[in-house]
């Protein structure tokens, strides 16, 4: 419990008549008050005595404490001062007390002031008028104290408003003796150095800053008092960790995804992990918040309180009525226009700046009202400023006395009560507070950071040989006189370093114990390993008899530890034996495999029963079991089979490479022949085979056992040529249409090349291929001309047949005379144009003239000639039948040969049908021409006998039948020709 901080809040009040009591270390330091009243005290009236009612004062958070205080009397001087104050009530009523928050709560108490139990002053009762007394007995002006828990913030003194009342020094009444009593009634408050103070914002400063958000979402802060704004968060609004981080170069930020990272504003570096420097300051801040508001960041309050208590106990015993303030009352600072005097030179206290509360002749002191109903009059000290400063400095100087002096003063001021009745904690706190007075260092320390100071303090603990089981009080007695004790300025830091040192010491001791125990284990294990007689089957009882005299066996005291190490050693021996057996077996297997590899008589198809006798002769075979030998032998045979398969696979791959090379060479030969024109799309395999069968390239590919044959490659090349020729033919057709070049039966190859030379590059196309395309196009042009000629012949015959139906047309008729007759006929007007119809008309008239002349000549021919003519006609009929049969045979022959000369654009069947139709059409044309000649001959023969009636009758009848038959044949031929025209139009592909 001595190592823990006491709660720095309100402590229970103890009666001053008890023995001397030291304040706990966590108590706030007392405050030095100097009261200089500015109002002339009245002399006629007496001051009212103190009420027996309990003294009440506002503590932390506004809680009113009821403290039992015995009735006492004031000094006679107080009566005179109060008399003057009653004489001038008008002036006193004008005095207004303005109470301002005084910062953090501070205890204004002096419980360690010793008051004799029998001491008392006469204090007659005087009725005090309600005139607004500015002291404790005046109007109930209750001081309000903020609930902040630190000393930071601005200290605002109470302001006195109203007219200033000037008086002379002789009008002031002193109510406290100016000797030792002055130090009793003026407790010292030692202000820490400015370097050690870390001011926290006051409640008023916190309300001055207002947080706002800009249009872009950024936060800024505005001060209502100074009318200034800033992007940076003010120190007054920072949290505990933010204030701690402000002492470092690192700053915490958050990424868009919420992760926290840390940025160093000096080195411009960022990291995802918290730097060690930030961790240290945050831990210190957290420890300070746990230990109390005065544990970190300011000088340790317990140290200041201890010094103040020491100074108070060192002073002689004063009047009991002059101990006025209680625990829990906050620090009250009263300032004046006078300058604060400097501290006494040569003072050994580390706290240099001491607050001295002074009041000038123009100011009045303000104290808290200790009751809500009845106020208690507390005397006000009146003395000169020089005397007060001197006494205050003496009090501060006395705080550095030795332990003996402090103890002596405490004993003198203690009241009745045995020493044994004091509690242990109070006694320990007293010892600690007394030993704390020795922290007056003659030398100052300077460290780069706090870690160095902690290391120095830990080195002090180490040099003092502080044990891991020591308490803080034990360590204090050993290290308090060392100058390194002041390396850490606050008691919280020293205790934290002390606890860390104890933890490190315990850890080091534990590590040392483990190392010593480990060495004993290793020695015992080494003893077992050195013994050759130990085997995996050795028993523990036998082991004990073997090593019972060995020092290493005795050093290990616990029987359980010995047996555990022995069992572990036996397990290791078993494991080593098993591993050794496995290694031996593995080595024997490897040697046996090498032996099998050296035997040339073992083949992939060898049998174990045939080679077993030959293998067992070798010693390497006898090292293994029979089953192991058989398994290894079978595995070796499988390896041989795999090797043989791999060899075959490699040979097969090499053969495939050779055959692929032969095919590539034959491909090159085909490409070469295509380039020279020896191989075209119409080349036949039998013809090509006769050319290449004697070449070595063909012989090489013919020897291939797999892959494509030479014929397959040839057919692929021909098929590719057909596709390329078809593309070339389409391209040339487009060029001819673009150039408007028409091929005719009389066109030559040179003319054809010239017409397409500008659009097609001939160096890339052999003339052989180009000649094939030209021949196909020329044949197509001839077929087209023949078709046009046949079409015109049919139209001529059709028109002539129509002209024969007109009776008005004779051999002497002319076109101009009968033009209206021909043009007026619908059938005639649809056939050709006018010039064509005129030409046909003139041809028909010429035919009539020839017939007329032939008839005239036939009249002169004798009868026997006509009979010969009839015989010739029969002979002509038989000849006609023979021609028909011959045409039919030619048709079949051409149909059989058509499959080799079919068009590349049409299927073979369609090409054969076309060739059949062509031969049929040619046969029909020959037949028609023969028939027409026969008809003409028949007509001429009848015309020759036109003089007889029978001949004339017969001629007229034949003429009508011939006309009807011709008309029917004409219609059939027109339908047939129309179908043929549709098949052979220019837009169709036609023959290749």
From Swiss-Prot:
One Pfam match: WW
Biased composition, class Basic and acidic residues, residue ranges: 420-441, 860-892, 900-909, 927-943, 963-981
Region (Disordered): 1-22, 307-329, 361-442, 855-992
SMART domains assigned to the protein according to its UniProt record, in alphabetical order: FF, WW
UniProt-recorded Gene Ontology molecular function terms: RNA polymerase binding
Source species, domain of life: Eukaryota
Quaternary structure annotation from Swiss-Prot or TrEMBL: Interacts (via the WW domains) with the phosphorylated C-terminal domain of NRPB1 (via CTD domain).
UniProt name for this protein: Pre-mRNA-processing protein 40B
Species whose genome carries this gene: Arabidopsis thaliana (Mouse-ear cress)
Gene this chain is encoded by: PRP40B
């Amino acid at each position: 419990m001595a190592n823990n901080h006491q709660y720095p809040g309100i402590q229970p009040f103890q009666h001053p008549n008890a023995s001397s009591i030291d304040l706990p270390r966590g108590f706030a330091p007392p405050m030095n008050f100097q009261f200089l009243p500015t109002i002339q005290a009245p002399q006629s009236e007496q001051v009212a005595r103190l009420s027996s009612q309990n003294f009440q004062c506002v503590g932390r958070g506004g809680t009113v404490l009821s403290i039992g205080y015995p009735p006492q009397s004031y000094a006679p001087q107080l009566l005179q001062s109060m008399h003057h104050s009653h004489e001038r009530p008008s002036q006193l009523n004008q005095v207004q007390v303005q109470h301002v928050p005084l910062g953090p709560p501070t205890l204004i108490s002096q419980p360690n002031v010793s008051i004799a139990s029998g001491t008392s002053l006469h204090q007659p009762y005087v009725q005090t008028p309600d005139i607004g007394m500015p002291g404790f007995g005046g109007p109930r002006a209750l001081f309000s104290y903020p609930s902040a828990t630190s000393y930071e913030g601005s200290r605002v003194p109470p302001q006195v408003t109203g007219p200033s009342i000037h008086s002379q020094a002789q009008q002031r009444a002193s109510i406290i003796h100016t000797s030792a009593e002055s130090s009793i009634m003026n407790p010292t408050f030692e202000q820490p150095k400015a370097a050690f103070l870390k001011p926290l914002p006051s409640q008023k400063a916190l309300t001055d800053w207002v947080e706002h958000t800009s249009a872009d979402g950024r936060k800024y802060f505005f001060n209502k008092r100074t009318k200034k704004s800033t992007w940076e968060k003010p120190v007054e609004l920072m949290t505990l960790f933010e204030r701690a981080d402000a002492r470092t170069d690192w700053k915490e930020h958050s990424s868009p995804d919420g992760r926290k990272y840390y940025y160093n504003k000096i080195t411009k570096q960022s990291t995802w992990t918290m730097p060690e420097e930030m961790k240290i300051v945050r831990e210190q801040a957290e420890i300070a918040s746990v230990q109390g508001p005065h544990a970190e960041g300011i000088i340790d309050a317990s140290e200041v309180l201890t010094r103040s208590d020491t100074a108070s106990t060192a002073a002689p015993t004063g009047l009991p009525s002059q101990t006025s303030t209680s625990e829990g009352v906050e620090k009250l600072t009263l300032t004046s226009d006078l300058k604060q005097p400097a501290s006494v030179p040569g003072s050994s206290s580390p706290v240099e700046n001491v607050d001295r509360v002074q009041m000038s002749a123009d100011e009045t002191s303000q104290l808290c009202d200790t009751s809500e109903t009845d106020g208690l009059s507390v005397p006000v000290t009146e003395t000169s400023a020089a005397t007060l400063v001197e006494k205050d400095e003496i009090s501060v100087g006395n705080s550095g006395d030795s332990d003996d002096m402090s103890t002596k003063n405490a004993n003198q001021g203690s009241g009745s009560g045995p020493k044994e009745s004091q509690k242990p904690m109070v006694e320990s706190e007293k010892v600690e507070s007394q030993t704390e007075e020795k922290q007056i260092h003659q030398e100052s320390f300077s460290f780069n950071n706090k870690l160095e100071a902690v290391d120095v303090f830990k080195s002090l603990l180490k040099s003092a040989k502080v044990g891991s089981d020591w308490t803080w009080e034990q360590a204090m007695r050993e290290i308090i006189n060392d100058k390194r004790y002041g390396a850490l300025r606050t008691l919280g830091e020293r205790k934290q370093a002390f606890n860390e040192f104890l933890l490190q010491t315990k850890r080091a001791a534990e590590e040392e114990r483990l190392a010593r125990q480990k060495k004993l284990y290793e020695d015992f294990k080494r003893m077992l390993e050195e013994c050759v007689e130990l085997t995996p089957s050795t028993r523990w009882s036998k082991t004990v008899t073997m090593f019972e005299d060995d020092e290493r066996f005795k050093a290990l005291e616990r029987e359980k530890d010995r047996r555990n190490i022995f069992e572990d050693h036996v397990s290791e021996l078993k494991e080593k034996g098993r591993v050794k057996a496995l290694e031996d077996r593995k080595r024997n297997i490897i040697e046996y495999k090498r032996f099998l590899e050296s035997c040339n008589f073992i083949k992939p198809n060898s049998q174990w029963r045939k080679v077993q006798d030959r293998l067992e002769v070798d010693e390497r075979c006898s090292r293994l079991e029979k089953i192991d030998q058989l398994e290894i032998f079978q595995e070796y045979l499988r390896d041989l089979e795999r090797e043989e398969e791999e060899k075959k696979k490699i040979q097969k791959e090499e053969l495939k490479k050779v055959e692929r090379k032969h095919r590539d060479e034959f491909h090159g030969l085909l490409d070469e022949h295509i380039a020279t024109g020896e191989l075209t799309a119409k080349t036949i395999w039998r013809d090509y085979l006769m050319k290449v069968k004697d070449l070595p390239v063909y012989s090489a590919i013919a020897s291939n056992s797999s892959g494509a044959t030479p014929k397959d490659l040839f057919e692929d090349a021909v098929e590719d040529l057909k596709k390329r020729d078809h593309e070339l033919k389409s391209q040339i057709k487009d060029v001819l249409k673009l150039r408007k070049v028409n091929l005719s039966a009389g066109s030559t190859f040179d003319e054809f090349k010239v017409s397409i030379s500008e659009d097609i590059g001939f160096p890339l196309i052999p003339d052989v291929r180009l000649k094939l395309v030209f021949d196909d196009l020329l044949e197509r042009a001839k077929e087209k001309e023949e078709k046009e000629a046949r079409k015109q012949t049919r139209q001529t015959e059709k028109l002539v047949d129509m002209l024969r139906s007109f009776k008005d047309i004779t051999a002497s008729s002319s076109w101009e005379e009968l033009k209206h007759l021909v043009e007026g006929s619908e059938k005639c007007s649809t056939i050709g144009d006018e010039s064509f119809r005129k030409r046909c008309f003139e041809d028909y008239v010429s035919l009539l003239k020839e017939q007329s002349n032939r008839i005239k000549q036939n009249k002169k021919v004798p009868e026997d000639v006509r009979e010969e003519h009839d015989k010739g006609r029969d002979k002509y009929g038989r000849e006609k039948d023979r021609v028909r049969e011959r045409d039919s045979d030619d048709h079949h022959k051409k149909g059989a040969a058509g499959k080799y000369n079919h068009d590349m654009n049409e299927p073979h069947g369609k090409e054969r049908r076309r060739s059949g139709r062509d031969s049929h059409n040619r046969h029909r044309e020959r037949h028609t021409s023969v028939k027409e000649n026969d008809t003409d001959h028949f007509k001429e023969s009848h015309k020759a006998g036109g003089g007889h009636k029978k001949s004339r009758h017969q001629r007229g009848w034949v003429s009508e039948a011939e006309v009807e038959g011709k008309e029917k044949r004409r219609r059939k031929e027109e339908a047939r020709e129309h179908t043929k025209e549709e098949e052979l139009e220019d837009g169709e592909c036609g023959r290749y």
